[in-house]
Amino acid sequence: MAIEKLSPGMQQYVDIKKQYPDAFLLFRMGDFYELFYEDAVNAAQILEISLTSRNKNADNPIPMAGVPYHSAQQYIDVLIEQGYKVAIAEQMEDPKQAVGVVKREVVQVITPGTVVDSSKPDSQNNFLVSIDREGNQFGLAYMDLVTGDFYVTGLLDFTLVCGEIRNLKAREVVLGYDLSEEEEQILSRQMNLVLSYEKESFEDLHLLDLRLATVEQTASSKLLQYVHRTQMRELNHLKPVIRYEIKDFLQMDYATKASLDLVENARSGKKQGSLFWLLDETKTAMGMRLLRSWIHRPLIDKERIVQRQEVVQVFLDHFFERSDLTDSLKGVYDIERLASRVSFGKTNPKDLLQLATTLSSVPRIRAILEGMEQPTLAYLIAQLDAIPELESLISAAIAPEAPHVITDGGIIRTGFDETLDKYXCVXREGTSWIAEIEAKERENSGISTLKIDYNKKDGYYFHVTNSQLGNVPAHFFRKATLKNSERFGTEELARIEGDMLEAREKSANLEYEIFMRIREEVGKYIQRLQALAQGIATVDVLQSLAVVAETQHLIRPEFGDDSQIDIRKGRHAVVEKVMGAQTYIPNTIQMAEDTSIQLITGPNMSGKSTYMRQLAMTAVMAQLGSYVPAESAHLPIFDAIFTRIGAADDLVSGQSTFMVEMMEANNAISHATKNSLILFDELGRGTATYDGMALAQSIIEYIHEHIGAKTLFATHYHELTSLESSLQHLVNVHVATLEQDGQVTFLHKIEPGPADKSXGIHVAKIAGLPADLLARADKILXQLENQGTESPPPMRQTSAVTEHISLFDRAEEHPILAELAKLDVYNMTPMQVMNVLVELKQKL
């Protein structure tokens, strides 16, 4: 970037840009934010705005682009959405009073993880993550700058770090240490994260827990340092850090949550078709965020689960009160976001009016809960602090029809400030005085069309047409001449105008000052507002669970101290809702305390995967405090759920690979305990038949002998059903079918014992494969059944030569296949495997 012979303003731009090389610099110049040089060229393309140049006649004109300051947020949103950072440089003094170049400073750096003022309101959290490392220990901290939530945990390996980042759906990671090339490739390329670095620690430790492990402390303090460095202001809404461990909740990795469609449908990526979609009858943005959090982190503490269940039961028992409650919640705005706007100094009159409306709804919500007269609700009622003094202040101060822009006037309610009322009186009386002057001069001059108008340039003036110029009184003085008329003033009109303008200016300044004082006063209540937000959110989620329990015919599950599972006529609630009017066929799931594995056989499309997901979904719902879809349900409290479910039953899209199968299987057998739930669907199908069968059997035996976790294992390897005779904690079940007149009907019912035949050819028939192909498949099947595992003779070839292609021959010919053949995947970490695959893919 050339800096020779620059104007003072451009030199100022260059100096500031040097400090923020990784961000688009929006440089305030009057009513526009301007961008120059590479920023202008890139922004013009990304934002689809005009690219022009400064000093067009120079040898090297400077590329320039700009956006209006009043609509800048929508352009900032686009840049942030695409993963860029934006530095905002504001004018720090009035250009009219500036001596030399106007003083400018960067007042905020907006990044994907620090967005607080988006033009697209969203009820989702936007977490900014920080990770640091000390030896083999990782510290992971994260916060939401909008809600002020702040958490930290310690993790033992980088795979767990990546899993937690995926669960948080973070877009930006602040790094406190130098990544290895392998780690950077995973975070930046595979996970598509924006990476930022922070080596300094935040000195003010009042938000930190000094009992944290060193690496957790550094991750937290570096996150705070990064946030303060980019936001450049006091962030009084940030809550003290809360330490957690992933083992404190029902553990599920990202793949498990995706395969179960917990917060979004894996196929569409949308909310519809997920558990979140099913359970969301919340009425507030805060409640929606909390519900999503509960789904992500179900409980393992029976006492806390039962506490939630009891509130849901109270709401079910009080239908009319619950209806009043939901109506009252509709009047509640997003307190957490309003509190953050106060902290960031971005509150406008509309925000304060929304806050007052919300606070005025709290006594009604509290009264409804108190009216139910249930001790179970006491802890919720205690959180509903209406803060009446704050509601009274805002209601008394802010005019109901106040504009959104602070400087537009008309913000403060009449009667709140005596001096301001006097200024307003002058403005009102001035208008009357002007009307009186107009009438008086019209009568005295005899000019029937004489009237007083106003514009910013000439102020108030008498408008006289050319035909009436001969009747203009002598005390009129000319202010402007137009083609068909002239404009005049008088000393009296000028005096009144001066009084009015002075009153307006003083009124505007005083009104702004009063609003700033009110905003500062509101800032003193941030902690109480956040506590209130948490209370309202909890009430909202629990009433939502009650509504869903009622409309979806759910029942309260029971938890035993043993490992027995007994779900009578259970249903997959999401599938049932998606099916609508169609009849959903329930299934009973029973596993005695001494049964650890159900081996499930049956054809594709028969419902095996749905049956497996049904159990996992029921467990998640139960442990987050929801009622469940069944006639009755007795469950243990699981500490973790592990799944390996591919593209089955039209629930999850995408094709699995053998490598992913083995990695996910390894994750399960490495971390599962006897209190875990494991779901394996067709494990081993990604490799040769005997390899797959051998691996499947060995995994079953390992779980049976060394782990003892409750396991549903669906397989096409019918030979594995013989394990029931040798593994005492394994039982066979199958999906029932009805065969009649050569037609197979899937009954979608799980019954004891192994399946007697696959019905795979019937599935192929449903898929529309050619009739002659299906006939040939029937013939081959009959020969296989008669000859055991011996292959049938090939069909007679009509051509002279048939070429059989060997994969092993191809491996010798293609260098990438040769490299794959050399890999010892069983002695490699998942991270190493993924890294090798990425490198090989780049060579294709």
From Swiss-Prot:
- What are its GO biological-process terms? mismatch repair
The cross-references to CDD domains, in alphabetical order and at most eight, read: ABC_MutS1
Q: Identify the HAMAP family for this entry.
A: MutS
Entry similarity comment:
Belongs to the DNA mismatch repair MutS family.
**Stated name of the protein:** DNA mismatch repair protein MutS
Q: Which purpose does this protein serve, as stated in its record?
A: This protein is involved in the repair of mismatches in DNA. It is possible that it carries out the mismatch recognition step. This protein has a weak ATPase activity.
Q: Which residues bind ATP?
A: G602, P603, N604, M605, S606, G607, K608, S609
Look up the domain of life of the source: Bacteria
A GO cellular component annotation in the UniProt record? cytosol
Q: Does the keyword Transcription apply?
A: no
Question: What organism is listed for this UniProt entry?
Answer: Streptococcus pneumoniae serotype 19F (strain G54)
UniProt xrefs under PROSITE patterns: DNA_MISMATCH_REPAIR_2
UniProt GO molecular function: ATP binding; ATP-dependent DNA damage sensor activity; damaged DNA binding; mismatched DNA binding
InterPro entries attached to this UniProt entry: DNA_mismatch_repair_MutS, DNA_mismatch_repair_MutS-lik_N, DNA_mismatch_repair_MutS/MSH, DNA_mismatch_repair_MutS_C, DNA_mismatch_repair_MutS_clamp, DNA_mismatch_repair_MutS_core, DNA_mismatch_repair_MutS_N, DNA_mismatch_repair_MutS_sf
The record's keywords, sorted A to Z, are: ATP-binding, DNA damage, DNA repair, DNA-binding, Nucleotide-binding
- Write one Pfam family the protein is assigned to: MutS_II
